């Protein structure tokens, strides 16, 4: 009995370690967006460099999710978990010591990729440690860690940046490195070796050709979008090259499917609920660009401090946490209808932000707004948009996975999360490009630029809402609506 009790206690210690990792992955992004204006001023980071750092982090994270999950399946999961956390800590330390923009960006990209490898290991641990009926609670605890990181990240980032006007952003990476090394140590000490030793040819089952084709194709498509502001036409040659590589990736994965070892199961896209849900996840990824443009607008446009900016952004996390709790409970009963409600609520929230923004100071008087006015003018809209985000993401994942066989659940979840992360990266690139273009066109009118970005984000969410409504109307009787 004592041995059994110790085993159960260790499971929850492992969950606690996983909470630390989820907190790390979320708080890194939340703090980083707050620090962008200071990094721009101290490191001379241009528009392209900003996109490489913020959107590049999301892209690197996304590209490593599926390969990371496969690596954990065929090799030693604990070893993958711990070594990737160590790499993340080393990359964060390197970023804190960076002396050039290229050094900083490369460090951030490595950090994002390393955390992308770590993330699917958590799902693997839970699959092995808990049965289906038990998994709800540990996943709920991960949701708590996510909400805490989302709410505290902007505030913590603001505090650290305010500590030192020149190098406060470096403290953010020091904090990230400390958390990563702590999680790696706890993981090594607490997590048992849950997988059997791999055979000599384990690497073949990671589909290395598929990984290379996928990464090269996505990066080739992504570079011209990021470097567009450099007006370098030759870079656009990479776009068709990337498209051709991705076509080759599709053919390769179909061939691998016949052999039984594809990197991604493209046949899942023919499952109606999965295909539509994955598309909604990609489109709604644009919502996360709100954090980036909001941090730039409130600091560079309106003239507030990083700490004030973090406090103003905090209500988004409260709404997201509440929406996640409610959405998780309603997902099985109301299905895609909850997703549609969440998307609609996000749109209403963005509209409320635009209305509240009308009462903020214009570009001609950037320093006259008080913190209470910011909370009153933007807070309600942020709470609503965050509530909509929580009502969208978890229910959409539940409904999207509802018709996927258990034998394909791992691949399906990896593809879904990858699509959402790619949507985040593309959204940041597209929205930030529109932001800078509007600033150039209007002579630096931040108010017009911010409203333009809100309209673009709203357009993506509107398309996702139309897809959700189409699914509700045309879904057959007996399926989860």
What are these regions (language model features)?
Residues 162-279:
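Hydrophobic transmembrane-helix bundles of small-molecule transporters
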Residues 47-48, 132-142, 306-307, 406-415:
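Loop-to-transmembrane helix entry/capping segments in MFS-fold secondary transporters
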Residues 120, 141, 146-158, 218, ...:
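Glycine/proline-centered helix-kink
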Residues 55-69, 115, 119-123, 314-326:
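Central cavity-lining transmembrane alpha-helices of secondary-active solute carriers
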Residues 73-209:
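Helix-loop-helix hairpins in multi-pass membrane proteins, especially solute transporters
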Residues 11-27, 32-34, 235, 260-441, ...:
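12-transmembrane solute porter fold
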Residues 33-64, 103, 307, 311:
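Extracellular/periplasmic helix-loop-helix junction of adjacent transmembrane segments
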Residues 38, 69-70, 74, 159, ...:
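Membrane-interface helix termini in secondary transporters
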